[in-house]
Every structure is written in C-alpha cells, then in structure tokens.
C-alpha cells in the first residue's frame, strides 16, 4: 500500500506528534486507505493491514490522520464502545478544507460510496458535501463558496 522503509518507529513517530490528532478505528485499513486516496486525494505515508498514516495537502491546507485496525486496540477501552455499533463516528464531522466537494462527490459516487449530502453553498461561507466512508465516518470536504 505504501512504502514505509523511511517511516519512523512507532515510538519516534508518537513522540513527534503535536497539536490535535485524529485516529480512526476501522474494520479494514486497506479499504479505508482506498477511500481516503480515491475520494479525498489523500496520500498514504505508511500503510499496512493494521495501521496507516494519511496526509492531505492542498493550497494552504494540510492534514494528517491515522487509521488503526480494530485488532490493534485489543487492550484499549475504545474497542469496547464499538462492539454493538454498525456506524462509527456518529455525531462527528471530519472536515477537510480546500478539498473540492463537487470533485470529491463525483469520486465517491464513482467508487460506490454513500453521499449523505450533495455539495451545497452554506451560510457559513463554505461549499461542502457530506460523504460516509466504509466505516460510517462522515467526511466533509469544503471550499470557500464563490461570490
């Protein structure tokens, strides 16, 4: 999926993290990486069947997030919260700015992903859409609306 020979060790990577982080627990890391690459135009910095680091860069925007397979969380209390949940991330929006919603929706539809809301101009100055990934996390690509 991604060549990670230059990626730091888990300990080294973890020590370098700053600010706020997003870590999504997913059932199938390769499937979620495919969604991020195909729909959001993200790049897999490193990825295997259990873990991935994804980056998105467009214009002045940059984002990085991690994916962990459920099995990697065997000792983590979060896994217990997901046992009876069919759609993950309910109530949370993961917003990706400077990601064209019209283009993202076209890619999502081509890939068979669920578009929750078509692109629309919103009163808060953005044009955005709502797209569900394979685990039900809601991604909101958005750009400043024209005019």
Name every feature range the model reports, one short phrase each.
Residues 2-23, 43-99, 103-132, 143-147:
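Vicinal oxygen chelate
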Residues 24-28:
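Short, surface-exposed ligand-recognition loops at beta-strand->loop->(often short) alpha-helix junctions
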Residues 29-30, 101:
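Generic non-transmembrane alpha-helix signal with a bias for helix starts/N-cap capping motifs
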Residues 40:
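Major-groove DNA-recognition helix of helix-turn-helix-type DNA-binding domains
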Residues 32-37, 108, 133-136:
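Conserved active-site tyrosine of GNAT-family acetyltransferases
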């Amino acid at each position: 999926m991604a060549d990670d020979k230059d990626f730091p060790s888990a300990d080294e990577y973890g020590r370098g993290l700053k600010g706020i982080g997003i870590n999504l627990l997913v059932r199938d890391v390769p499937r979620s990486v495919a969604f991020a690459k195909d729909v959001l135009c993200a790049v897999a910095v490193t990825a295997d069947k259990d873990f991935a680091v994804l980056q998105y860069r467009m214009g002045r925007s940059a984002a990085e997030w991690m994916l962990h397979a459920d099995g990697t969380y065997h000792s983590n209390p979060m896994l217990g919260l997901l046992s009876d949940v069919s759609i993950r991330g309910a109530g949370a929006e993961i917003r990706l700015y400077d990601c064209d919603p019209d283009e993202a929706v076209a890619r999502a539809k081509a890939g068979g992903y669920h578009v929750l809301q078509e692109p629309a101009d919103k009163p808060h100055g953005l044009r955005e859409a709502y797209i569900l990934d394979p685990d039900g996390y809601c991604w909101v690509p958005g750009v400043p609306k024209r005019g």
